[in-house]
A protein has these predicted regions:
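Conserved short beta-strand elements that form part of the metal-binding/catalytic scaffold
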Residues: 29-69, 109-110, 116-123
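Core segments of cupin and vicinal oxygen chelate
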Residues: 2-5, 11-54, 90
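Short linear motifs in intrinsically disordered
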Residues: 28-31, 77, 97-99
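General N-terminal targeting signals
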Residues: 21-29, 57, 72-74, 91-93, ...
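Vicinal oxygen chelate
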Residues: 1-15, 35, 43, 60-127
Length: 127
């Protein structure tokens, strides 16, 4: 039976894609390619046991995406949450750090387009 292998990409609209791409490059250190996108390779996630790509619909009434009014939230797995938060602070980006969870550490920021970004430092799975 044919099956989906995983997420092949996330594509979204922006009123100023160039400025938004620069923000992700400058604030979060994403390696933006000449064509304007970022490629995440499987080996980067594989190097961090416990990391995974999750696809989850939320109830339409959820407040978890707040303060954003966007219909989606992006979760970015990171290898050093404290380091990313320090970079955010240097760029004037406010972050909300959540209590540690069994699957890792989380913080929330909002990008210039108003999209909530969840930063996740995975905790290794119990073996």
């Amino acid at each position: 039976m044919a099956r989906v292998l995983g997420i092949g990409g996330v594509f979204f609209k922006s009123n100023d894609p160039g400025a938004l791409t620069a923000w992700y490059r400058d604030v979060l250190g994403l390696d933006v390619q000449d064509w304007g996108g970022v490629v995440f390779t499987p080996d980067a996630m594989a190097a961090h046991p416990g990391a995974a790509t999750v696809f989850t619909p939320f109830e339409s009434e959820t407040t978890y995406f707040g303060p954003s009014t966007r219909e989606f939230m992006v979760n970015l797995a990171v290898d050093d949450l404290d380091g990313i938060l320090a970079a955010c602070a240097r760029h004037g980006v406010e972050a909300t750090v959540l209590p540690d969870q069994p699957n890792g550490r989380f913080a929330h920021i909002v990008d210039p387009d108003g999209t909530k970004i969840e930063l996740w430092q995975p905790k290794p799975m119990a073996g």
